[in-house]
């Protein structure tokens, strides 16, 4: 089960377990290759269920992709709003997991200093594809969709979330009163933004309904650059509960509900 970007992560894991990676195999002919990249781990995963996953990326992430500082500040604000006011700066429990870039919190380093070092790192200005923000960008997600395909021996299910409503006058989608205040800006932007730029994923009104950071359309299944089969009418049982239905096919995205 994967929530938000976790859904993209487990899709990639399934792709690697089932098929390995040709580039890794070609680069590791001395026997040092990890079994993860050999394609010898089929049938390790029975099913994949994604919750509010941006399979097609988030149009808001695309907006802030050019300014990673805004994205990080936004994420920190959400963390703070969830943690509450009583946050111990020296024991915040936050690890950016960027060790491979040398961005490790040093002994006795304050989180403020650690955070500033991360935000001011040169890795953000290189626009590398080896960062999560690329996979969350709509164009980057399309690349991932073309690589991490639905596997024919795995069941796929998805659940979307919405916390917006349609404005009858403009047709735009607006945040509900229950929306986390930190997501009002992103939700409002997503609920009216379109982009028809040539050479990029087109953002149409179909993307407007959202949960604050992920559009319902994106959470249903991979669309952009994807050949995955799908059933968008899988639904729930008569009792309103998720029920595994007879005849459910593997290798097919089954959309449950929002």
Residue ranges, per PLM feature:
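Active-site catalytic pocket residues across diverse enzymes, especially alpha/beta-hydrolases
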Residues: 17-21
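Gly/Ala-rich beta-loop-alpha elbow adjacent to hydrolase catalytic centers
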Residues: 2, 6, 10
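Active-site signature of alpha/beta-hydrolase-fold catalytic machinery across serine-
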Residues: 12-16
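Short beta-strand immediately N-terminal to the catalytic nucleophile in serine-hydrolase-like folds
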Residues: 1-2, 51
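Helical cap/lid subdomain of alpha/beta-hydrolase-fold lipid enzymes
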Residues: 23-24, 30-258
């Amino acid at each position: 089960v994967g929530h938000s970007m976790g859904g993209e992560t487990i899709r990639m894991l399934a792709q690697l377990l089932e098929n390995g990676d040709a580039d890794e195999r070609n680069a590791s002919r001395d026997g040092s290759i990890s079994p993860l990249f050999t394609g010898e781990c089929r049938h390790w995963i029975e099913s994949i269920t994604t919750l509010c996953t941006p399979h097609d990326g988030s149009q808001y992430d695309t907006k802030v992709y050019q300014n990673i500082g805004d994205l990080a500040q936004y994420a920190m604000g959400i963390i703070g709003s969830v943690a509450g006011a009583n946050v111990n700066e020296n024991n915040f429990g936050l690890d950016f997991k960027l060790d491979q870039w040398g961005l490790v919190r040093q002994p006795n380093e304050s989180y403020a200093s650690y955070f500033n070092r991360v935000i001011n790192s040169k890795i953000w200005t290189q626009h590398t594809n080896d960062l999560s923000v690329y996979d969350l960008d709509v164009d980057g997600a399309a690349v991932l969709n073309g690589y991490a395909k639905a596997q024919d021996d795995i069941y796929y299910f998805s659940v979307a979330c919405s916390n917006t409503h349609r404005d009858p006058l403009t047709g735009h989608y607006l945040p509900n009163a229950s929306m986390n205040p930190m997501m009002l800006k992103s939700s409002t932007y997503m609920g009216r933004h379109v982009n028809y730029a040539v050479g990029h994923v087109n953002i149409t009104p179909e993307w407007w309904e959202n949960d604050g950071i992920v559009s319902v359309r994106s959470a249903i299944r991979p669309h952009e650059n994807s050949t995955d089969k799908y059933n968008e009418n899988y639904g729930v049982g008569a009792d309103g509960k998720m029920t595994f239905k007879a005849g459910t096919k593997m290798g097919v995205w089954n959309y449950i509900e929002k």
